[in-house]
């Protein structure tokens, strides 16, 4: 077997339509386009979303919401995720290294979901009231 002898398996690719080759082919004369009308002509297709002059769906419905540009730079981390980082001091750099927050994140907030694995010191990261209580109850501390 050589690379130049390899071909597609039989039936894996549909055969090319040969139009205009007689009545018996079912693609003769009008070539499967029917009689007259816009879709029978060359270049006779309308743009996507065109509804024949009726107000298109995209324009009938109101605009809703927006995507905040700030979302890229703010992240949330749970107490359970913090325990994966390990003990010691936890800051923005440590969370980025552990892959818990995106590298472009500028602000991080720890939320009280789950439980703290051990004693940790949180430095330079926002903390909710519940998360602060859980960290301090586990013997850790929160530094601003």
UniProtKB/Swiss-Prot annotation:
Gene Ontology terms: cellular component: cytosolic large ribosomal subunit
GO biological process: translation
Highest taxon of the lineage: Bacteria
Region annotation Disordered: where it falls in the sequence: 1-25
InterPro entries to which the protein is assigned, alphabetical: Ribosomal_uL15 (IPR030878), Ribosomal_uL15/eL18 (IPR021131), Ribosomal_uL15/eL18_sf (IPR036227), Ribosomal_uL15_bac-type (IPR005749), Ribosomal_uL15_CS (IPR001196)
RNA-binding as UniProt keyword: yes
UniProt-listed Pfam families: Ribosomal_L27A
Annotated PROSITE patterns: RIBOSOMAL_L15
GO molecular function: rRNA binding; structural constituent of ribosome
Coiled-coil parts of chain: none
Keywords: Ribonucleoprotein, Ribosomal protein, RNA-binding, rRNA-binding
Family annotation (Gene3D superfamilies): 3.100.10.10
Family: Belongs to the universal ribosomal protein uL15 family.
PANTHER family: 50S RIBOSOMAL PROTEIN L15, LARGE RIBOSOMAL SUBUNIT PROTEIN UL15M
Subunit field text: Part of the 50S ribosomal subunit.
Biological role stated in the UniProt entry: Binds to the 23S rRNA.
Protein name: Large ribosomal subunit protein uL15
Taxonomic classification: Bacteria, Pseudomonadati, Pseudomonadota, Gammaproteobacteria, Methylococcales
């Amino acid at each position: 077997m050589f690379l130049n002898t390899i071909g597609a398996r039989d039936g894996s690719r549909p055969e090319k339509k040969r139009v205009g080759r007689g009545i018996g082919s079912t693609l003769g004369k009008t070539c499967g386009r029917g009689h007259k009308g816009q879709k029978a002509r060359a270049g006779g297709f309308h743009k996507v979303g065109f509804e024949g002059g009726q107000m298109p769906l995209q324009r009938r419905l109101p605009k809703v919401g927006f995507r905040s540009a700030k979302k890229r730079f703010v992240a949330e981390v749970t107490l359970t995720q913090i325990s994966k980082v390990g003990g010691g001091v936890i800051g923005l750099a440590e969370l980025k290294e552990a892959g818990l927050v995106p590298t472009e994140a500028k602000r991080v907030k720890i939320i009280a979901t789950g439980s703290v694995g051990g004693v940790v010191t949180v430095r330079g990261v926002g903390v909710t009231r519940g998360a602060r209580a859980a960290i301090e109850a586990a013997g850790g501390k929160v530094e601003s």
